[in-house]
From Swiss-Prot:
The protein's name in its UniProt record: Small ribosomal subunit protein uS19
Stored Pfam families: Ribosomal_S19
GO terms for MF: rRNA binding; structural constituent of ribosome
Primary role: Protein S19 forms a complex with S13 that binds strongly to the 16S ribosomal RNA.
Annotated source species: Koribacter versatilis (strain Ellin345)
NCBIfam families tied to this protein: rpsS_bact (TIGR01050)
Taxonomic path: Bacteria, Pseudomonadati, Acidobacteriota, Terriglobia, Terriglobales
HAMAP family for the chain: Ribosomal_uS19 (MF_00531)
Length: 96
């Protein structure tokens, strides 16, 4: 939790790119490694490609995301699912 008087943290290079695009009325994808940056209202409507450690995941920013971190929307781990064999064994066991 960050102090209220400090304000939200956002890397300066990300903020500069967003402000520049807002001034030009452009909507381009911004590639960033800054998962720690907080989403601010100026980012709404933009798409940021956030690095997950392997590749860039496109994140379209909506109003509901304001106040969250960019890294929350670019998952670093992929859930492959439980094995089908284990799921069928537990379903086939009779209840005691």
């Amino acid at each position: 939790m960050r102090s209220q008087k400090k304000g939200p943290f956002i890397d300066t290079h990300v903020l500069a790119k967003i402000e520049d695009m807002n001034n030009r009325n452009e909507k381009k994808v911004v590639r960033t490694w800054s998962r720690r940056s907080t989403i601010i209202p100026e980012m709404v409507g933009h798409t940021l490609a956030v690095h997950n450690g392997k590749k860039f995941i496109p994140v379209y920013v909506t109003e509901n995301m304001v106040g969250h971190k960019l890294g929350e929307f670019s998952f670093t781990r992929q859930f492959k699912g439980h094995s089908v064999k284990a799921a069928t064994e537990t379903a086939a066991k009779p209840a005691r």
